[in-house]
Amino acid sequence: MQTHVRRVALQALRPCLRAGLMAPKFPVRFATTAVSGELLTKTPYTRPGYAAQWTCLVVLFLKNQLLMRLFFAFVAYVVAMKVFGARFHVDHDEDATPAE
């Protein structure tokens, strides 16, 4: 029962412990991590550097811009076909007399 009370109290006070506003009076196992050690993966993970992060952001932005522009071009084409039909030019009769 005492372990459960400690765990509940620790869960409630975890933000204060992380911020350094309180010092625990008893040894705590889960003070700094919200996930138990058994659930953590053993593979080492290193965060990407700033260059990799910015490269990823730029690539995603350009990809999304390209898709958006292609989509709008397709929509404009469909609307133009519906409004104007398949003809985009006016036929000229070469044999007609010039208008005066």
From Swiss-Prot:
GO CC annotations, alphabetized: mitochondrial inner membrane
- Where would you find the membrane-spanning parts of this chain? 66-86
Q: Which domain of life is it from?
A: Eukaryota
Location relative to the cell: Mitochondrion inner membrane
Instruction: Tell me the keywords, alphabetical order.
Output: Electron transport, Membrane, Mitochondrion, Mitochondrion inner membrane, Respiratory chain, Transit peptide, Transmembrane, Transmembrane helix, Transport
What are the boundaries of the transit peptide? 1-30
Q: How does it assemble?
A: Plants bc1 complex contains 10 subunits; 3 respiratory subunits, 2 core proteins and 5 low-molecular weight proteins.
* Function description: This is a component of the ubiquinol-cytochrome c reductase complex (complex III or cytochrome b-c1 complex), which is part of the mitochondrial respiratory chain.
The name this protein goes by in its record? Ubiquinol-cytochrome-C reductase complex subunit IX, mitochondrial
Name the species this protein comes from: Euglena gracilis
